[in-house]
Amino acid sequence: MAKIKLSAISTRAPKKADKEKLKAETEKILVELDELQNRLIAESKHSLLVIIQGMDASGKDGILRDVFGSLNPLGVSVTSFKAPTAEELSHDFLWRVHEAAPAKGMIKIFNRSHYENVLVTRVHPEYILNEHIPGINSVKDIKPSFW
């Protein structure tokens, strides 16, 4: 399997993109994804976690529909992380992430992720108090080394 260096892939669309060519390439990739998913399910040795992170209206739902919509729905599920529920807040910071992790043979897509919480808490450190982190009982307990 080829190694992919994500930092070498531009996040911007090409200026002169040939939409028909891109659609044809996408179709080819979707066929390959279908084959890989079948192997993943059959072997049941590994799982795949895909994290889609982006601002509101950045196209996350379009990616889910256009890329993952062609896969076998029995082998794919999506979890959207919104504001934590009372049950989630009663556990540690990563509990809901671990609860949503994919089983072997499955593909799980996180529509947003716990990484977003890291960014939000830098702006609103008081939110950390809801995460039940040992030794942090007030905002004053959050030392610079925490970040």
How would you describe each model-predicted region?
Residues 1-147:
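Glycine-rich phosphate-binding loop of ATP-dependent small-molecule kinases
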